[in-house]
C-alpha cells in the first residue's frame, strides 16, 4: 500500500500539467471557446478551429450498415435555419434537435448531410453511431462506437462532421444550402441549414427565419512546418470499394431519398479530430493567405475564380475558344501541334447544317485551284476533267456546271501550288456557300516561290483516290501558274479547250469544290457541297428517273465533329474534307456509292494528352463512361486467410512441402529403427554347447 500511493500521486500531478488534456500529451484547444459564434444546440466553433493533425477522439470501428434495418416510427421536420456572416471562415452548422433518447437507455444514431443545388441533391457526409448514452448528443466520446465517415467529394472533402453538426468553410457571397437527416432511435429529424458570407443581410433567397449572426466565423491559424507529411492521405480520403455510381461524377439522389454508404464515392478511416483538422487545412489552402499569414477580412463575389486569393487559377477554355471564333484567340494559343485537324468544314447560314457559320473576313488558304465563274444564262457547258500530276496529289480543280439539258466542255482549270489569298469574285455564284479557312493570316505568308520538289503531304491531308467517270475526250495535264494568275486559259497557256460534247439527260447544278493542301501544324480548308437536294451532286437532279432519292447526309456527332483545328483531335470521316471534285454520273448507271471514310494512320501515342478524346464508333460506349462494377470480395480458402488469393496458393504450397518433408522424416526414422532392431537380434546369437564324447586312444 505504501508503494502504490506515491505512484498514484505522481500520476495525478502529471495529468494536471498545463497544455495537456487528460494526461494524453495532446495539446488542448488553441484558443478559449467563443460563445458568440455558437449555433443553438451546437458546440463552440473555436474548439474545432485548427489546421494541424490531432488524435483526440477514439477511432472508428468498422463500416456502416449497407441497408436500413427498420424504418423510423416518426418523422420530425424542423424549420429552415439560416445565418449570414460578414467575413469568411469555418462555421459550425448545428441542427435544432432536442432530446436524445431516454436518460437511462442507449440509442443508435444515423447522421447524413446533403448539399442542395438547383440540379442536384448530393450526399456529402454519412456516419453511424452505436451505443450512445441517452440524453446526450451522439459523438465519438458519448457513444460506444461509430463507423467510418463516408464522403461525397474530394479528395479531400472540404466539409467535416462534428458529432451531429456540420463544419462548413465559407468565403463567397453565394449561399449554400444543406439538408440533414438525423435518425435518433426511432425518430428521423429532417431540415435545412443555410449560410452565406458578405452583404448587408440575408440574401433574397434566404428563408424568413434567417438573421445576422453575431460575431463571425473562425479562421484557423497557419500551422508551422509541415505537420501533415506524416499523415497518410488514405486515412482521411480513400476510394469507397462499395460505391455503385460513376467515378468522378457527383451522385444525385431524388428528394426525400435516404442515402446509403454505396452512394458516396470516398471513405475516411481517421477519427473525427483528424478530419476536422484536414478541413481547416483545406480552407487555408483554398483561401491563400497573404505573405504575412493574414487572411483578408472579406472576399468579393467570385474571389475563388478570379480574385487575388484564387486557390486554383481558372483553366483557359482553349478548346471552346477555338471552336467558337478562331480569330478571337491569341496566336500563341493557336500554336501548331501534332494531331491538329487539317481541314475545317464550315458553311454559311443558308445551309441546313447546324454547324454552319458565315465567314467574317476572307482568309488566305494554302493552295486553291479556282475556276472562272459561269453565268447561268450563258451557253451551257459540259464538265471538263483535269488530271493533276503525281507530285501535286493534294490539289484539285474547281468545276462549274450549268443545269441545262446539253453541255459543252469548258477549258480546264489551272491548279496553283502557291499560297495566295483568294479574290473576292472567285466564288461561283449560286453555290450556296462561301470560301472559309481556319488558317491565320499571320501564319501564312502572302507569297512564296514555286516549289521545285514535291511538297510533303500530311497523313490526314492525303486525298482519296477517285474513280474516273465517263469522259468524252482524254484530259489535258494541269500546269502550275504564277501567283495570282487567273484560272482562265490564255493564249500562252499549253491547255487547249476540248471539243464540245453533249450529254443526254439532266445534269448537276453549279458545284464549286476546292481542296487545299496544308503542312503539318497548319490548318487548311475544304468546301462542302450544298446540302440543298436541288443542288447537291448526289441529289434528285443526278438520279435517274424513277430511282429513290438518296438519304440526306446524317449528322455524325455533336459540334465537335465539325469544329476547327486546335483541339488535338484527328480529322473526322467526312467526304467533303477530301478535296475531290464531284462529277456528274451517267444517267444510265446508278449513282456511285458513297466512298468509305479515311481513317488516320498516325502511330499510337502521337496525339498527346488528348488521345482519350478520339471518337469511337457509336455502338461502343466510351471506356471512361462505363460503370465500373464493385470488385468481387475475396473468398479465402480458410478463415484465417484474408489477404489475397496469392496467400492461399502460398499456403497450399507451403503445407504440401511441409507435409512431404514430415512424411520423409517419418519414413527415414522408421527405416533406421528397423535396422537397429535387426542388429540387436544378431548381435547375441544363441550358442548351444554339445558334450563331446571323450577321445579314446
UniProtKB/Swiss-Prot annotation:
Start-end of Low complexity biased regions: 375-389, 402-445, 481-529
Composition-biased stretches (Basic and acidic residues): 322-335
Family: Belongs to the alphaherpesvirinae glycoprotein G family.
UniProt feature, compositional bias: Acidic residues: 560-576
Region annotation (Disordered) ranges: 298-389, 402-630
UniProt-listed SUPFAM superfamilies: Immunoglobulin
Protein name per UniProt: Envelope glycoprotein G
Compositional bias annotation for Pro residues: 446-457, 465-480, 542-552, 587-603
Membrane topology: Single-pass type I membrane protein
Virion surface compartment segments: 23-648
Ranges in the topological domain labelled Intravirion: 670-697
Main location: virion
Other facts noted in the record for this chain: Glycoprotein G is much larger in HSV-2 than in HSV-1.
Keyword Membrane set for record: yes
Protein task: Chemokine-binding protein that inhibits neutrophils' chemotaxis.
Subcellular location as annotated: Virion membrane
Transmembrane segments: 649-669
Keywords assigned by UniProt, alphabetized: Glycoprotein, Membrane, Signal, Transmembrane, Transmembrane helix, Viral envelope protein, Virion
A Pfam entry, by short name: Herpes_glycop_D
